Amino acid sequence: MDVIGDLSMDNYIFQYYQKIQDGSISVGKWIGLLFSYIVKGLEEKEFTFNQKKANNAISWIEEHCFHVEGVLAPGNLKLELWQKALISVMFGICDNDTGNRRFREVVLVVARKNGKSLLASAIANYIFQVDGGFGCRVYNVAPKLEQADIIYNNTWAMIQLDPEYIQKKESVSEERKHTHNKVDADETLVKKRMSDLFIPATNSTMKKSVQTQKNLMDSILH
């Protein structure tokens, strides 16, 4: 079933919540309140959980996203339970009537050197290539360009490491040797242009942008 009414242990949200409740995982006050709210909302059917949407995001990220630096590079990204629970909330919690995602904005606060840029890059990559739909626009915004570059460059590095991308690119190159016509498969390849990443087939782009600290805070708070 796509929509799961009961909360089973196959649900990463519930797994994480149970570990918070039994004390095997320690979290801050607001994380505890958040997952209590989510679980209560599911139990009372205030919104629904779409297991397929949640699992699609998790599976795609673990298959197509990679460590791009350090000793784990270039290995596949293996999500921890809290990351799976977060992604399940983002993509799997849906409105009862429309079936659309319930949450349009997510604020994630993670301490330095705990992989927040890596996770953000993986989520951005999934939205850019899969979930965003036709004409998707993904913006990496920071007070300084070098900060905005981090997720943007991570995403491009992940794309280049993806065996599916490599195979498709090789296939396009081989086909071009035998024809002067347009190669259809080339339209589905991610292109790195001067100012963005671009997928012709879906007219999707990923860009980086600079905003002042004040504008960033305004966009978060409002």
Per-range role (PLM):
Residues 2-222:
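Phosphate/NTP-binding elements of NTP-utilizing enzymes
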